[in-house]
Swiss-Prot record:
<dbReference type="GO" id="GO:0005576">
    <property type="term" value="C:extracellular region"/>
</dbReference>
<dbReference type="InterPro" id="IPR039670">
    <property type="entry name" value="NPC2-like"/>
</dbReference>
<dbReference type="GO" id="GO:0032934">
    <property type="term" value="F:sterol binding"/>
</dbReference>
<keyword id="KW-0732">Signal</keyword>
<keyword id="KW-0964">Secreted</keyword>
<keyword id="KW-1015">Disulfide bond</keyword>
<dbReference type="InterPro" id="IPR014756">
    <property type="entry name" value="Ig_E-set"/>
</dbReference>
<feature type="disulfide bond">
    <location>
        <begin position="90"/>
        <end position="95"/>
    </location>
</feature>
<dbReference type="InterPro" id="IPR003172">
    <property type="entry name" value="ML_dom"/>
</dbReference>
<keyword id="KW-0020">Allergen</keyword>
<feature type="disulfide bond">
    <location>
        <begin position="25"/>
        <end position="136"/>
    </location>
</feature>
<feature type="signal peptide">
    <location>
        <begin position="1"/>
        <end position="17"/>
    </location>
</feature>
<comment type="similarity">
    <text>Belongs to the NPC2 family.</text>
</comment>
<dbReference type="Pfam" id="PF02221">
    <property type="entry name" value="E1_DerP2_DerF2"/>
</dbReference>
<feature type="disulfide bond">
    <location>
        <begin position="38"/>
        <end position="44"/>
    </location>
</feature>
<dbReference type="GO" id="GO:0015918">
    <property type="term" value="P:sterol transport"/>
</dbReference>
<protein>
    <recommendedName>
        <fullName>Mite group 2 allergen Der p 2</fullName>
    </recommendedName>
</protein>
Length: 146
């Protein structure tokens, strides 16, 4: 019995290990956000000059032929558009999207080497459809380091 409990505990820990706590900034379409190396509400370290991976599962709130990614970062209170983003979300998931269906988007981009170091970073990621916001998440526990 103890072996089964241990196995179940390890399985749950493995599944949840990269899940990040985020605030929904739309209508609760976000089901989960995964970032390798980031856990729950612990600070997520973003490394300058390195790839950053993000995976989100969301439920489409509209039928849409296209989808666009918008990523903004508030660094020590100054909000900026994140440079180097490929805005075409259809490159990272199958389009068109159907209202009520769940989608998994996996996105990787290189963090610019010139990004300022900061211990106070808030990242907002939006996926936009033909009729507005499909999904939106805010990660408040991020830091930019070398």
């Amino acid at each position: 019995m103890m072996y089964k409990i241990l196995c179940l505990s390890l399985l749950v820990a493995a599944v949840a290990r990269d899940q990040v706590d985020v605030k929904d900034c739309a209508n609760h379409e976000i089901k989960k956000v995964l970032v390798p190396g980031c856990h729950g509400s612990e600070p997520c370290i973003i490394h300058r000059g390195k790839p950053f991976q993000l995976e989100a599962v969301f439920e489409a709130n509209q039928n849409t032929k296209t989808a666009k990614i918008e990523i903004k970062a508030s660094i020590d209170g100054l909000e900026v558009d994140v440079p180097g983003i490929d805005p075409n979300a259809c490159h990272y998931m199958k389009c068109p999207l159907v209202k009520g269906q769940q989608y998994d988007i996996k996105y990787t981009w290189n963090v610019p080497k010139i990004a300022p170091k900061s211990e106070n970073v808030v990242v907002t990621v939006k996926v936009m459809g033909d009729d507005g916001v499909l999904a939106c998440a805010i990660a408040t526990h991020a830091k930019i380091r070398d």
